[in-house]
Amino acid sequence: MTNFTTSTPHDALFKTFLTHPDTARDFMEIHLPKDLRELCDLDSLKLESASFVDEKLRALHSDILWSVKTREGDGYIYVVIEHQSREDIHMAFRLMRYSMAVMQRHIEHDKRQPLPLVIPMLFYHGSRSPYPWSLCWLDEFADPTTARKLYNAAFPLVDVTVVPDDEIVQHRRVALLELIQKHIRQRDLMGLIDQLVVLLVTECANDSQITALLNYILLTGDEARFNEFISELTRRMPQHRERIMTIAERIHNDGYIKGEQRILRLLLQNGADPEWIQKITGLSAEQMQALRQPLPERERYSWLKS
């Protein structure tokens, strides 16, 4: 007899029966809605392993997961059969979560393939009859009508690549972000100076946001162009020159410190004496320990690209 680690005898009996292919096939032939049943090649039933879905999610369910090929033979359909011996007001949402997890796991092997259909089925034999709750997860919202409009339609899209710059600069405090990220792949950002000056003069960003913005420009370009960019920016904004130069200097200093740390890491990884490095740098034992953490592979040889 097959043993199952389950929370109740109900679950154990359910799994003993519904993990048997012939029993599962009969169950689906009898209980699947006709239009869905006709999509499935029930002769191709395959019981999926327990590792198919995240363990934390599986702990919420007493379920069985079968996969079947479609009748056209191209693609898969999954059937989740959930067992419940007492009602749960959020059962529909739980089944939706499980279905999403199955879809995610399916496409992890090949992100180009379409999402599979996942058919959740609930097997119920609780003391309260008939089953009292909707099995449409959209009915669980306080406003099901709005939920249907939201989740049955395409989600809102903010595609800055197609928004005219003249419109973007009217977007108040989010304008700087949208403008820079729209044009960041341009080799030369000097053409944006006029618009950036207008936005910065209107105090549409705080110091931390401007720091992040300038650092972003530096990281995605080169230092010479960055210095030219800063010079032109301060020329156009003499009243903000000190503020911008202070931020730019802070960015340069931070980059210099990180560069020094990277060099010391490389020295250690290539056999340099740790005591010698500690002596000439004056670093503490804790700082030396931090330096012993290996560089990510992509950073190890980045100097070759310069």
Curated annotation (Swiss-Prot):
Belongs to the Rpn/YhgA-like nuclease family. One of its GO terms (biological process) is DNA recombination. Keywords: DNA recombination, Endonuclease, Hydrolase, Magnesium, Nuclease. Its EC number is 3.1.21.-. One of its GO terms (molecular function) is double-stranded DNA endonuclease activity. The keyword Nuclease applies. It comes from the Bacteria. InterPro entries: Rpn/YhgA-like_nuclease (IPR051699), RpnA (IPR010106), Transposase_31 (IPR006842). Disruption phenotype: A quadruple rpnA-rpnB-rpnC-rpnD deletion shows no change in basal RecA-independent recombination. It comes from Escherichia coli O17:K52:H18 (strain UMN026 / ExPEC). This is Recombination-promoting nuclease RpnD. A low activity DNA endonuclease yielding 3'-hydroxyl ends. Expression of a repaired protein increases the frequency of recA-independent recombination, but also decreases viability probably via DNA damage as measured by induction of the SOS repair response; in a RecA strain expression has no effect on viability but does induce the SOS repair response. The keyword Magnesium applies.
